Design a protein with these regions (language model features):
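Conserved NAD(P)H cofactor-binding loop of Rossmann-fold oxidoreductase domains
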Residues: 84-92
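Conserved glycine-rich cofactor-binding loop
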Residues: 12-13
Length: 232
């Protein structure tokens, strides 16, 4: 039997790598992406099983997205897409009044446009397998935190687009997940100079994501903390 195939963006570190490690250990074949080719190669070299093609590039690049789609097809077709790659933009985060339009455009391209475009490219594969689209969101998508307007509005757009996709593709499962605070470089960039050593490791979120994939509840928005509470 062929292994199920997952495409995971932003998989060289943090939550992307933690989930990739878990899925690889459970027999999945992975197509993983990140911008830093060397870091991605080091990360994927630790993954069990395989094959796990590492495709370095920027998710905002249409050529790179097509390559991800083609590599997934070569492995047999994707059953799961995890849109995890993300950016905060400037660090420290600026107020809306100080948000440069070019920076905001980049936030939208990475956090909203690229996930939607990659999803569209993989839809034929996902439809054939009644697959899953897992979009990593944030509480900033629903809460009005000062200086988080650029990132939060991009993630809010992703949340709503996910709801529309779920309505249009009822055979798929389309999830947005708020993972909560994590001890990641991205979180450190959001709070430069702050000690974040008390934040949970990304690996602590993986059981919640695994529960979604195993149980296939209705499409929707979920908080990792709630999923963990149900599991326990």
């Amino acid at each position: 039997m062929n292994s199920p195939v997952a495409v995971i963006t932003g998989a060289s570190q943090g939550l992307g790598l933690a989930l990739a490690t878990e899925l690889a250990a459970r027999g999945w074949s992975l197509v993983v992406d990140a911008r830093d080719a060397d870091r991605l190669a080091r990360a994927t070299s630790t993954l069990p099983g395989g094959p796990h093609p590492a495709v370095a590039g920027d998710v905002t690049d249409p050529v790179h997205r097509r390559e991800l789609v083609e590599v997934a097809a070569e492995l047999g077709g994707a059953s799961l897409l995890v849109n995890n790659a993300s950016t905060l933009g400037a660090s420290p985060l600026p107020a809306f009044a100080d948000l440069d339009p070019a920076t905001y455009r980049r936030l939208l391209e990475v956090n909203l446009v690229a996930p939607l475009a990659l999803t569209a490219g993989l839809l034929p594969q996902l439809r054939r397998r009644s697959g899953v689209v897992l979009n990593i969101s944030s509480d900033a998508a629903v809460e009005a935190y000062e200086t988080w307007g650029g990132y939060g509005s991009a993630k809010a757009g992703l949340d709503h687009a996910s709801r529309v996709l779920a309505a249009e593709e009822p055979r798929l499962r389309v999830y947005t997940v708020d993972p909560g605070d994590m001890r990641t470089q991205m979180h450190q960039d959001a709070f430069p100079g702050e000690d974040i050593s008390d934040r949970p490791e990304p690996e602590s979120v993986v059981p919640a994501l695994r529960r979604l994939l195993a149980d296939r509840p209705p499409s929707g928005r979920y908080r990792a903390a709630d999923l963990r509470a149900v599991a326990s």
